[in-house]
Amino acid sequence: MAYPFQLGLXDATSPIMEELLHFHDHTLMIVFLISSLVLYIITLMLTTKLTHTSTMDAQEVETVWTILPAIILILIALPSLRILYMMDEINNPSLTVKTMGHQWYWSYEYTDYEDLNFDSYMIPTQELKPGELRLLEVDNRVVLPMEMTVRMLISSEDVLHSWAVPSLGLKTDAIPGRLNQTTLMAMRPGLYYGQCSEICGSNHSFMPIVLEMVPLSYFETWSAVMV
């Protein structure tokens, strides 16, 4: 998870987030090279006193600076499109969880079970135990099996919300009257934190999300107790 004064991104926990990190590094390198070239050209223009008074046109240079940006844009667009299609692909999810946003809490329903649903509220600061995180802990965590594809159906009861868990590369808008879906798969067990990422009112900052990814056997035990 994130920590104070962190310079980089959070560690990837899902295949999608790993792809996003690679794409970030790929794009950042291209931007760095372009910025360095532009800075070098500006430095040359400011330091040299020579001028090409006899040069009226440069067809070759114009051709290069037309084709080269097009190639660069293609190099950025192709990996981006690949990840977009990967994020939209849903193949035989093992579990479906319906998530509803409210002012200002989340409710969850495990649709594969008859009566497995609960609300998830933030734990107030004065009720936190030692070691728990301020503004990030909830009274009911979303327990999910690791290394399995889980489909999240996301909507809202009132205003716009956004269900986001950065370490899993997830951010899906919760829109009233509309059902959005996304998939997640965690490669390792642990607690993964997120927050509502759409300003939704005065208590927008107090809508944390906590996913507890556990082995399948633990999930089956938990679901049997909850039902």
From Swiss-Prot:
Gene3D superfamilies registered for this protein in UniProt: 1.10.287.90, Cupredoxins - blue copper proteins
GO molecular function: copper ion binding; cytochrome-c oxidase activity
Residue ranges annotated as Mitochondrial matrix topological domain: 46-59
Catalytic activity: 4 Fe(II)-[cytochrome c] + O2 + 8 H(+)(in) = 4 Fe(III)-[cytochrome c] + 2 H2O + 4 H(+)(out)
Cofactor note: Binds a dinuclear copper A center per subunit.
Cofactor(s) needed by this chain: Cu cation
Sequence positions that bind Cu cation A2: 196, 198, 200, 204
Keywords, alphabetical: Copper, Electron transport, Magnesium, Membrane, Metal-binding, Mitochondrion, Mitochondrion inner membrane, Phosphoprotein, Respiratory chain, Translocase, Transmembrane, Transmembrane helix, Transport
EC number(s) from the headed UniProt entry: 7.1.1.9
Membrane topology classification: Multi-pass membrane protein
Principal subcellular localisation of the protein: mitochondrion
KW Mitochondrion (keyword) present: yes
GO biological process, one term: ATP synthesis coupled electron transport
SUBUNIT field: Component of the cytochrome c oxidase (complex IV, CIV), a multisubunit enzyme composed of 14 subunits. The complex is composed of a catalytic core of 3 subunits MT-CO1, MT-CO2 and MT-CO3, encoded in the mitochondrial DNA, and 11 supernumerary subunits COX4I, COX5A, COX5B, COX6A, COX6B, COX6C, COX7A, COX7B, COX7C, COX8 and NDUFA4, which are encoded in the nuclear genome.
Protein name, entry field: Cytochrome c oxidase subunit 2
Protein source organism: Vulpes corsac (Corsac fox)
Taxonomy of the source species: Eukaryota, Metazoa, Chordata, Craniata, Vertebrata
